[in-house]
Structures are given as C-alpha cells and as structure tokens.
C-alpha cells in the first residue's frame, strides 16, 4: 500500500473530489443538525460519515446500472 508523509494512503483519483466530499459533509451535517468538530460526540460525527458512504454507494450503483456486486 502506498504511504505518504501525511499518513493517509487514500490517493484521490479525481481532481476536486476532496472539495466535493467536504461540501457533501457540510450539507449532510446541516440536514442532520450536527455541528461537526471535536466537541461533538463520535456518534453524531459518525452519523455524517455513514450517510456520506450510503449516498456514495447509492450514486455508484445508479451510475453502474444498479447491479449488485
């Protein structure tokens, strides 16, 4: 697995993806009434991450013909 100085091995393949994910994170947090940050519970912050994953999987399924993998 590739490793870089930041300790994060997730390499973005699409320019601008990080900004799009950050925007999605802020929109979902707003929908859920969650103020993201260190003072928020792990459960609340995690609910936002879980919803991001759910929406990204749904988006991928729709764009791949809706097939099960």
UniProtKB/Swiss-Prot annotation:
GO BP terms, alphabetized: DNA topological change; sporulation resulting in formation of a cellular spore
Site, Cleavage: residue positions: 27-28
InterPro entries per the UniProt record, alphabetical: SASP_alpha/beta-type (IPR001448), SASP_alpha/beta-type_CS (IPR018126), SASP_DNA-binding (IPR050847), SASP_sf_alpha/beta (IPR038300)
GO molecular function: double-stranded DNA binding
Keywords from the UniProt entry: DNA-binding, Sporulation
Superkingdom in the source lineage: Bacteria
A Pfam family: SASP
Recorded family membership: Belongs to the alpha/beta-type SASP family.
Further information: SASP are degraded in the first minutes of spore germination and provide amino acids for both new protein synthesis and metabolism.
Reported function: SASP are bound to spore DNA. They are double-stranded DNA-binding proteins that cause DNA to change to an a-like conformation. They protect the DNA backbone from chemical and enzymatic cleavage and are thus involved in dormant spore's high resistance to UV light.
Protein name in UniProt: Small, acid-soluble spore protein A
Organism (species): Bacillus subtilis (strain 168)
Annotated gene: sspA
């Amino acid at each position: 697995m590739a490793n870089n100085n930041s300790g994060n091995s997730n390499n973005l393949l699409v320019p601008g993806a990080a900004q799009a994910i950050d925007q999605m994170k802020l929109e979902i947090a707003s929908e859920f009434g969650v103020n993201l940050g260190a003072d928020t519970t792990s459960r609340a912050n995690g609910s936002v991450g879980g919803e991001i994953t759910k929406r990204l999987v749904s988006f991928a399924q729709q764009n791949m013909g809706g097939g099960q993998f």
